[in-house]
């Protein structure tokens, strides 16, 4: 137990001493909150001109999280750099020499980074919600309304899982450029295409971001017939995260440090 505590402290020192930690997490907060606030204000100004069908399905809570699409990209960068920086700098050899137990090394790093992201994600989610609702005026939702608190807490969990999934992928690929070169297009382009094209919707709905984002919905979308609820979607996302971490651990255990 003493060894694990020492490793956790070491990983915390590494993470907080790297400049990328500050700018990636700060960017995630600023972008998510700013875009959500802006689009909430726009929705309020355009609400009376919306078609009746759109007004009936309008989700004031979810519009606050419109910035998550961009904010999650910063979380992906953070997750990748937390793991891959040690490979790109060569520090992985020193780290594994100091901590021979590879499970202890990897999961201590993941635990520290995930705890930090969870705090940042929750702050971001609550800030985006309250500022977004302030911009919505009479169309706002309240934290005590049915499903709203679940959606706001879920927003923080969603950002955390995105970052941890990225850590698992980076542990498998080791290269920051390769990891980002796969994850960025996957979440920003491929997932959206698969989720919006009729022929591939049934596949796209089970991708991590598509499934996980349902936790932030309070009002169901028109025509949304997914076979899972908000927590079920987050559970699917959790399975993707577990698979990525398992793959990262297996490859770390089998490969030489380099």
What residue spans do the PLM features occupy?
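Helix-loop-helix units of permease transmembrane domains in multi-pass membrane transporters
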Residues: 81-115
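Junction motif at the cytosolic side of a transmembrane helix
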Residues: 236-258
């Amino acid at each position: 137990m003493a060894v694990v505590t020492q490793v956790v402290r070491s990983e915390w020192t590494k993470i907080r001493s790297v400049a990328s930690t500050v700018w990636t997490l700060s960017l995630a907060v600023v972008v998510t909150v700013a875009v959500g606030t802006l689009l909430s204000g726009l929705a309020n100004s355009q609400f009376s001109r919306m078609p009746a069908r759109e007004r009936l399905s309008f989700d004031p809570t979810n519009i606050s999280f419109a910035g998550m699409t961009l904010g999650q990209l910063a979380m992906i960068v953070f997750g990748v750099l937390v793991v891959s920086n040690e490979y790109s700098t060569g520090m992985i050899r020193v780290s594994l020499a100091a901590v021979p137990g590879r499970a202890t090394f990897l999961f201590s790093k993941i635990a520290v980074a995930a705890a930090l992201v969870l705090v940042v994600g929750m702050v971001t989610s609550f800030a985006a919600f309250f500022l977004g609702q302030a911009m919505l005026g009479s169309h706002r939702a309240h934290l005590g309304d049915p499903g709203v608190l679940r959606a706001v807490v879920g927003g923080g969990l969603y950002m955390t899982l995105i970052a941890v999934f990225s850590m698992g992928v980076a542990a498998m690929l080791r290269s920051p450029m390769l990891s980002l070169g796969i994850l960025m297009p996957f979440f920003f382009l491929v997932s959206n295409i698969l989720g919006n094209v009729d022929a591939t919707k049934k596949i796209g709905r089970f991708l991590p971001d598509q499934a996980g984002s349902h936790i932030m919905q309070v009002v169901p979308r028109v025509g949304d017939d997914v076979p899972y609820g908000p927590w079920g979607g987050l559970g699917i996302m959790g399975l993707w995260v577990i698979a990525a971490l398992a793959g990262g651990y297996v490859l770390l255990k089998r490969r030489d440090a380099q």
